[in-house]
Amino acid sequence: MADLEAVLADVSYLMAMEKSKATPAARASKKIVLPEPSIRSVMQKYLEERHEITFDKIFNQRIGFLLFKDFCLNEINEAVPQVKFYEEIKEYEKLENEEDRLCRSRQIYDTYIMKELLSCSHPFSKQAVEHVQSHLSKKQVTSTLFQPYIEEICESLRGSIFQKFMESDKFTRFCQWKNVELNIHLTMNDFSVHRIIGRGGFGEVYGCRKADTGKMYAMKCLDKKRIKMKQGETLALNERIMLSLVSTGDCPFIVCMTYAFHTPDKLCFILDLMNGGDLHYHLSQHGVFSEKEMRFYATEIILGLEHMHNRFVVYRDLKPANILLDEHGHVRISDLGLACDFSKKKPHASVGTHGYMAPEVLQKGTAYDSSADWFSLGCMLFKLLRGHSPFRQHKTKDKHEIDRMTLTMNVELPDVFSPELKSLLEGLLQRDVSKRLGCHGGSAQELKTHDFFRGIDWQHVYLQKYPPPLIPPRGEVNAADAFDIGSFDEEDTKGIKLLDCDQELYKNFPLVISERWQQEVAETVYEAVNADTDKIEARKRAKNKQLGHEEDYALGRDCIVHGYMLKLGNPFLTQWQRRYFYLFPNRLEWRGEGESRQSLLTMEQIVSVEETQIKDKKCILLRIKGGKQFVLQCESDPEFVQWKKELTETFMEAQRLLRRAPKFLNKSRSAVVELSKPPLCHRNSNGL
């Protein structure tokens, strides 16, 4: 029976994988719903205050670029060929071989440069033209051939074109998407969890599918009780910090994190899913690798380490078991549980796996940095070639003996190794850090220029253009059976109680990596969500021709911010009512959707603006003269932050002005005034 359950778990998992690759959006069981366009008022202020409304910030975000491109190609009157030129250059940079680059570079030159030069309409500098012409004439078609144009294209788009984008519906849509992104609160209900694929000291790893996009991920779940029992809180939180550091910027050679969240019992990391098994497993199945095969893995691992080291992260646990393969055979470095940030203080703890730890790591109290990873790389490459670590001779398992040999033994390299390979390994396995390859100030660049990697195009490595030596079998999970992986004994943690102080440790644990979420959306449901939203907004615009548009009321007035909020209503203050609010310097107005009557609360009547909580939801509490309360709830986190800020500042400024005003202005008024729409329409530009 257990075997049947294991087979069914594998089949379900593999079917989910195949469907996710073909049509991930079709696998989405939840829908992303964009907020209404009126969100722009609040979101623009929110983003501006965080310096997020600039050309570079928007253009360099995936969703921002897609919307800007859509605006340039479909909504602006004047032609904007620069955007297509930019995309052509980006595609050119990904090309694999020189022949393809030569052909494409000439096409780009003829279409976007020569054609405009002949018509005397070329808007770019003479230096950019000469740079491309000079290199093309010598057939020097590197991936950076058009780099001067990238900079000038961005400069040409940064001015009036970007300003027009800011005034368009496409910028409104950008605000809608950013509101969704900044209001993500993940729970287990946002994922379909499949079979277990691994287990560690604190928890398990599962295959899972994200419900609203259909994308497949690995979910690493750490048990909070087990963490407490083993006093591993610092390690667990450190892994979250290290993953957040390395998961920004595109790196195809690290198992990166897209989300982190927690439940009352678990800490959850949502990571890149790797289906090809690990190098330790394949070493046992395939046998030792040739120099050529090892070189392939070395190049990709070097780029992964370079990405970490550029962010001042030392990995400290490099070994074949931590190198995972994807379905195509390319590799990623996984499990950053022992990684460490050395930007402010160098570590000196002895951590890692015996047989791969550098001498300076073994010498307690000795500070080290990225140097330790280059030594570990040497040990790992040796194992791929010989089947064992250079310091684990005769299959000894005595950790003290392995450490002693690491600190004292000179590694003898077999004669079958090529001179270039011997030179590489001798350089990496130097006990003296000052003599070690990668530790002379050039870091990864020292390895890239080593003779062993002569002829390697590192841009091709980055783009994963070299064919892997081993392709994992399709249609297999490439992981141990669920029953072989096993499970934790619940009795171990039966007596462990999680207290409020334990949960407080994890209050800042949740995280969304913006660029990775945007990429996930762009690859899956972006177009479908936009199309659905366009239909909904078109229907609402048609309906509002009779009723009047909520946002229109704020135009041409001194309205500070406007948008939907929930107001605690009815005589018993138990029911939330959705209303459209307008904040002016001296009052807060609101009305129901489609209603013509307007309600008003003056700043003069407000005693204080406070934050409160109702059923774990943050709310804005306005205390009103006479002991009454006015409670508002926002539909997203950014809205709450911005509305609370604007209401507080407006109230404080109104109080300052009232203290200076003549006393006769402070006549008693009712707290809330019901007004019909026509009198409001006849007010002056100050709203009075």
UniProtKB/Swiss-Prot annotation:
SUPFAM superfamilies: PH domain-like (SSF50729), Protein kinase-like (PK-like) (SSF56112), Regulator of G-protein signaling, RGS (SSF48097). Residues 1-190 are annotated as: N-terminal. It is an enzyme of class 2 (transferase). One of its GO terms (biological process) is desensitization of G protein-coupled receptor signaling pathway. CDD domains: PH_GRK2_subgroup (cd01240), RGS_GRK2_GRK3 (cd08747), STKc_GRK3 (cd05633). PROSITE patterns: AGC_KINASE_CTER, PH_DOMAIN, PROTEIN_KINASE_ATP, PROTEIN_KINASE_DOM, PROTEIN_KINASE_ST, RGS. ATP binds at residues 197-205, 220. PANTHER family: BETA-ADRENERGIC RECEPTOR KINASE 2, G PROTEIN-COUPLED RECEPTOR KINASE/RIBOSOMAL PROTEIN S6 KINASE. Interacts with GIT1. This is G protein-coupled receptor kinase 3. It comes from Bos taurus (Bovine).
